[in-house]
């Protein structure tokens, strides 16, 4: 049986964090942010990033984990957030995933794994796209898509 993870999703400033904190206090949980902007250090204004007062002593994960100049992908998020979830579960606590970035939430909950691509691989794909065009790459993608 899969471990329990509580997910709260919705638009920015809709009360997700306040609800997550209340539930964490009630159920013995910790909050894992699923917001594509709250991961960045210094991006507090306009992201509704919770203040220490709003956190009310509840541990929050995946806040301020990257510099705004860094590349940050859904794959990187899923690896880091999965480690947070595993750690929370290992301590007998409830992970409460709260945020509005559906791409992050969907991939985290689905447990998707992502391959690591080197710069060389990207260069090869870009060269092929220039030479053969994007339709050729699209056709290759269809070979690996089960519902195409």
What is the meaning of each model-derived region?
Residues 1-146:
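Phosphate/pyrophosphate-binding catalytic cores of soluble transferases and nucleic-acid-acting enzymes
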């Amino acid at each position: 049986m899969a471990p329990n993870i509580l997910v709260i999703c919705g638009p920015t400033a809709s009360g997700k964090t306040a609800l997550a904190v209340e539930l964490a206090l009630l159920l013995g949980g910790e909050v894992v942010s699923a917001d594509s902007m709250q991961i960045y250090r210094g991006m507090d204004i306009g992201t509704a990033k919770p203040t220490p007062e709003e956190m009310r002593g509840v541990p929050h994960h995946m806040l301020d984990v990257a510099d705004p100049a860094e590349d940050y992908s859904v794959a990187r998020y899923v690896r880091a957030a999965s480690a947070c979830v595993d750690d929370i579960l290992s301590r007998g606590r409830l992970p409460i995933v709260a945020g509005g970035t559906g791409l992050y939430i969907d991939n985290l909950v689905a447990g998707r794994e992502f391959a690591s691509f080197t710069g060389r691989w990207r260069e090869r794909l870009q060269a092929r796209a220039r030479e053969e065009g994007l339709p050729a790459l699209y056709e290759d993608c269809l070979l690996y898509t089960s519902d195409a």
